[in-house]
């Protein structure tokens, strides 16, 4: 029962933030719901940061994981809204818009999750080694990650 409360409290906050993001960003574009994309991208970025944190510190309680990932970010990011918006575009014969929205959500969310993990790792390295951590080292780390991402993307497109 206690786990359900943690999930519920997180879900209230996540759903409220998602609603506010939709109100703010959806009017910007008439062709698709930009707020849903922003909510999903932002949520995936935060999920990446939290994954890095939880991997580094597995002793963080299950309640925090339930509150943050299952509750808050589970209700902030939304697969159902995303899928209904894409299907609506397809049913209205806006195939190109639908496909573009689909790709932006899919690849954007994956990229933001990876970026969140990198942000966490970079911040952790800076926190642990503030004197020895300089811009040259930061650039080297970013370059190593960029090479990995480019390799993964190339493998993905070659697989077709």
Swiss-Prot record:
Principal location: membrane
Annotated control of activity: Na(+) is not transported, but it plays an essential structural role and its presence is essential for fluoride channel function.
Spans traversing the lipid bilayer: 5-25, 34-54, 67-87, 99-119
Disulfide links within the chain: none
Any one of the GO BP annotations: fluoride transmembrane transport
Keyword hit for Metal-binding: yes
Single GO term (MF): metal ion binding
Chemical reaction(s) catalysed: fluoride(in) = fluoride(out)
Pfam name, any one: CRCB
InterPro entries: FluC
UniProt keyword Metal-binding present: yes
Membrane topology listed for this record: Multi-pass membrane protein
Keywords attached to this entry: Cell inner membrane, Cell membrane, Ion channel, Ion transport, Membrane, Metal-binding, Sodium, Transmembrane, Transmembrane helix, Transport
Subcellular location: Cell inner membrane
Binding site for Na(+): 74, 77
GO cellular component, one term: plasma membrane
Similarity comment: family membership: Belongs to the fluoride channel Fluc/FEX (TC 1.A.43) family.
NCBIfam families named in the record: crcB, PRK14196.1
Annotated function: Fluoride-specific ion channel. Important for reducing fluoride concentration in the cell, thus reducing its toxicity.
Protein name from the UniProt record: Fluoride-specific ion channel FluC
Taxonomic placement: Bacteria, Pseudomonadati, Pseudomonadota, Gammaproteobacteria, Pasteurellales
